[in-house]
């Protein structure tokens, strides 16, 4: 897995521009709704990343659609194309459950993986580009950032690509997560993290261990792509996101200690927000248009008070929008799908392919194809998908098909469902399971049901009837017709 070399976001933008993957917009455009409209049209057309150099009312440029195509996601992960992301998945599968070499030849085969591990430790700097300019106290003013308002009924401007850095009271390793943050004042944001996410868990542990004490938080905007993508990739719990970013980039992740707390942030990030969450300080968040294509309901979340803003000279504000797919998170989902496959295959070798259709909000429906080996096998795989990786705990529907079905072709999948399923026998319903807070279709917020569809051929024990034989063309006839096809001139 040879990494494409770039040091920070600016290096990456130079690389994109050289390849025609970045467009500079010099015309003044408003971060209030207008940037979303332009970015949405561009993404749907498979267009470039956009750097808005003159956002109306602001001196700071806005970067959008950075990961607007699977190719750019792959480039951000240091790869030439999406197919190479399977190698990233294989590396993660290896790191999740490393196996010692079985001999010299196996050691030689695994040597590239062992060499990559050398890039895992972070490199701590004394000073960093992200601290070239410092604002603190009354000089902190979040309204100077060109924070986008994406949809007409959004409650307020929303930070969308903030890389939130936290650490629990009993942990050495930090957690990196991406949580949206509503702007509610010059130095106030609402931190919308769900209770199972790493940042929220760190906060709950802090409240239990240090009741009444302020919880330190830092947020990085415009980190290098490998670090951003490390925060949204299924990294094993034993591996930090910074370490994984080093593997992707091929060089150690450079970090620097914050000015007001002990958290370490990406040294090359464009902007850093430092501050704290006061225990008990909450505020109503939303509504916001989100990746489901709907506005979500209002709910209370902790308030993040910003005490320091540090940034690079001529900083760039990195942003995105979320809406009904396709949007940038959906594109990320398509690319990261290739990372998931080898991880699942290591645990379940019978899996041939795994697909999260973007139109299913990238995680709410999964199609699995497998080499079925015994009666009930499909149901075992369903349960495995729901339980093996926490990324799939919110997947509402799992469709399991045989390996003669293309998981990424709805024509194939629908054919399998309608010809190989009996609804009563082959549907599995599981009640009272964790469900995405944003899923308003569930009867209770955060709790709902799941459905598994066994669209495989049925084995003895699963049916008492003779099973249908698929129609297969005669290969000799096919070859004869191939030989005379042009002569027939049917389409000429």
UniProtKB/Swiss-Prot annotation:
The active site is at residue 290. The keyword Flavoprotein applies. Binds 1 prenylated FMN per subunit. The keyword Membrane applies. GO terms for molecular function: 3-octaprenyl-4-hydroxybenzoate carboxy-lyase activity; metal ion binding. Mn(2+) binds at residues 175, 241. Its EC number is 4.1.1.98. This is 3-octaprenyl-4-hydroxybenzoate carboxy-lyase. The gene is ubiD.
């Amino acid at each position: 897995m040879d990494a494409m070399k770039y040091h920070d976001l600016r290096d990456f933008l130079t690389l994109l521009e050289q390849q025609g993957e970045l467009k500079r917009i010099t015309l003044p455009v408003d971060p209030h709704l207008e940037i979303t409209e332009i970015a949405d049209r561009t993404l749907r057309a498979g267009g470039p990343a956009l750097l808005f150099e003159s956002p109306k009312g602001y001196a700071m440029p806005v970067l959008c659609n950075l990961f607007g195509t699977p190719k750019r996601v792959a480039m951000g992960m240091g790869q030439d194309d999406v197919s190479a992301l399977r190698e990233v998945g294989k590396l993660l599968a290896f790191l999740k459950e490393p196996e010692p070499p079985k001999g010299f030849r196996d050691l030689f085969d695994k040597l590239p993986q062992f060499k990559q591990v050398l890039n895992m430790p972070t490199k701590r700097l004394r000073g960093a580009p992200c601290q070239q300019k410092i604002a603190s106290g009354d000089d902190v003013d979040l309204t100077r950032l060109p924070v986008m308002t994406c949809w007409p009924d959004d409650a307020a401007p929303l930070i969308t690509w903030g890389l939130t850095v936290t650490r629990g009271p009993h942990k050495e390793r930090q957690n990196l997560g991406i949580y949206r943050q509503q702007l509610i004042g010059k130095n106030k944001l609402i931190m919308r993290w769900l209770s199972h996410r790493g940042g929220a868990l760190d906060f709950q542990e802090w409240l239990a261990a240090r009741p009444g004490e302020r919880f330190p938080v830092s947020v990085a905007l415009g980190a290098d792509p490998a670090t951003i993508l490390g925060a949204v990739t299924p990294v094993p719990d034993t591996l930090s996101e910074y370490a994984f970013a080093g593997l992707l980039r091929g060089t150690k992740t450079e970090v620097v200690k914050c000015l007001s707390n002990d958290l370490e942030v990406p040294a090359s990030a464009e902007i850093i927000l430092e501050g704290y969450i006061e225990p008990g300080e909450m505020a109503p968040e939303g509504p916001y248009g989100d990746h489901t294509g709907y506005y979500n309901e209002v709910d209370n979340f902790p308030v993040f008070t910003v005490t320091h803003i540090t940034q690079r000279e001529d900083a760039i504000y990195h942003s995105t929008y979320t809406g009904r797919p396709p949007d940038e998170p959906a594109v990320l989902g398509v690319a990261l799908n290739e990372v998931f496959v080898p991880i699942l295959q290591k645990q379940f070798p019978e899996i041939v392919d795994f697909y999260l259709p973007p139109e299913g909000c990238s995680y709410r429906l999964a199609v699995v194809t497998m080499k079925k080996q015994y009666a009930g096998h499909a149901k075992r795989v369903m349960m495995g998908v729901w339980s093996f990786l926490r990324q799939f705990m919110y997947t509402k529907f799992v469709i399991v098909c045989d390996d003669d079905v293309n998981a990424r072709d709805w024509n194939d999948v629908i054919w399998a469902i309608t010809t190989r399923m009996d609804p009563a026998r082959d549907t599995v319903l599981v009640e009272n399971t964790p469900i995405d807070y944003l899923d308003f279709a569930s009867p209770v917020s955060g709790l709902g049901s799941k459905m598994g569809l066994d669209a495989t051929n049925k084995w003895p024990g699963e049916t008492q009837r003779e099973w249908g034989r698929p129609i297969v063309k005669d290969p000799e006839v096919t070859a004869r017709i191939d030989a005379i096809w042009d002569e027939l001139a049917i389409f000429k």
